[in-house]
C-alpha cells in the first residue's frame, strides 16, 4: 500500500490558526460591549431558579434603585437565547425604574444540561430555540410571571416584552395569560388566535423587515375584528433587530440608531403610564386599533395609519 504524507507549510498553518482565532473572536466578542455595560451597572442582578413540574428555568433578575413598589417586566429574549445583550436590555429597563425578570428559555437544553451560555455558537443556539415546544415556552413564561407576581418589591402589575422570536412569544403570551397589564412586541408576528387576549398590545416594527412586516396587516385586521387594543408603530429606515443593532457600536445603519432611540422613548412612556394607571385590561374598555409609520427624522401620525 502506498502511503502519502501531506506536509502543510508552516506559513499556511499559521494563517489557518490566525483565521480560526479571528472567527472565534468575532463570535465570542460580538456582544462584548453589552457585557461591559452590564458589568459596570450599579444595579442588583441575580439568577433565580424557577420551578414548574419537573422543569427548572434559570432567570436573570434585575432590580432598580428606587423607593417604593414598581411594575415587573418579563423580558423574552431573541432567537439567540439569553445573550449579554438581552441581559443588558433588562438592566437598561431596570435603570428606568422597573424590576425585570428575563427567563433563559434554553435552560436545560444546552450542552451538559446548561442554558444559553453553554452553546458553542450562535447557530447552535438558534437551532435550539427554533426547536422549543411552544406550549413548553408558555409554561416557562407562566413560571416567570408567577414569580414576578410574588416579588415583594413589585406592585402587582406585570408586562411582557419580547424581541424578534421573543416578540412573537410576547404576543402569544398575551393570548395565554389573563393577568398581564400590557404586552410589548418588538418585530414579532401575532398569534393565530387573538380572541383570548386581555391586555393592550403595543407593536414596534421595522420598515425594512419584509418578513415580519407582511404579517402586520393581518394582525391589525384580527385585533380589530376581535375588539382588542393594539397600537403599533413602524419605523422607516430600520431593519429587523434594530433595538440591538441600534446600540451596537459596530452598527453602521443610522436608521437602526434612530429607530432604537424613538422606540425606547415610546416604550418608556408606555411603561410610565402603566406604572401610574390601575390594572390594564382589554376587557370592558373601548378597543383601539391604530398605528403609524415613523420616518427616520420625524413622526406625524395621521389617523390609524400614517404614511410619511
Where is each model-derived feature located?
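Serine-hydrolase catalytic machinery in alpha/beta-hydrolase-like enzymes
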Residues: 34, 38-41, 46-150, 244-252
Amino acid at each position: 500500500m502506498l502511503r502519502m504524507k501531506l506536509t502543510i507549510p508552516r506559513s499556511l498553518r499559521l494563517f489557518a490558526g490566525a483565521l480560526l482565532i479571528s472567527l472565534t473572536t468575532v463570535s465570542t466578542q460580538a456582544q462584548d460591549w453589552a457585557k461591559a455595560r452590564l458589568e459596570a451597572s450599579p444595579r442588583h442582578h441575580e439568577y433565580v431558579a424557577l420551578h414548574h413540574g419537573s422543569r427548572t428555568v434559570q432567570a436573570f433578575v434585575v432590580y432598580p434603585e428606587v423607593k417604593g413598589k414598581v411594575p415587573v417586566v418579563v423580558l423574552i429574549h431573541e432567537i439567540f437565547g439569553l445573550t449579554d445583550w438581552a441581559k443588558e436590555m433588562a438592566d437598561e429597563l431596570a435603570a428606568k425604574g422597573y424590576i425585570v425578570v428575563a427567563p433563559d428559555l434554553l435552560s436545560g437544553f444546552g450542552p451538559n444540561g446548561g442554558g444559553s451560555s453553554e452553546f458553542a455558537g450562535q447557530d447552535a443556539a438558534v437551532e435550539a430555540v427554533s426547536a422549543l415546544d411552544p406550549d413548553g415556552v408558555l409554561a416557562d413564561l407562566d413560571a416567570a410571571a408567577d414569580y414576578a407576581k410574588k416579588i415583594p418589591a413589585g406592585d402587582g402589575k406585570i408586562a411582557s416584552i419580547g424581541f424578534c422570536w421573543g416578540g412573537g412569544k410576547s404576543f402569544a403570551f398575551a393570548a395565554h395569560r389573563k393577568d398581564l397589564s400590557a404586552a410589548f412586541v418588538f418585530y414579532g408576528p401575532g398569534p393565530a388566535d387573538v380572541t383570548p387576549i386581555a391586555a393592550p398590545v403595543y407593536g414596534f416594527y421595522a420598515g425594512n423587515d419584509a418578513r415580519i412586516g407582511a404579517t402586520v396587516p393581518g394582525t391589525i385586521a384580527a385585533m380589530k375584528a376581535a375588539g382588542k387594543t393594539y397600537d403599533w408603530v413602524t419605523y422607516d429606515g430600520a431593519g429587523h433587530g434594530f433595538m440591538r443593532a441600534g446600540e451596537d457600536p459596530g452598527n453602521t445603519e443610522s436608521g437602526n440608531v434612530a429607530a432604537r432611540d424613538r422606540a425606547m422613548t415610546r416604550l418608556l412612556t408606555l411603561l410610565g403610564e402603566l406604572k401610574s394607571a390601575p390594572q390594564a385590561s382589554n376587557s370592558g374598555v373601548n378597543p383601539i386599533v391604530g398605528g403609524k409609520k415613523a420616518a427616520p427624522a420625524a413622526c406625524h401620525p395621521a389617523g390609524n395609519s400614517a404614511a410619511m
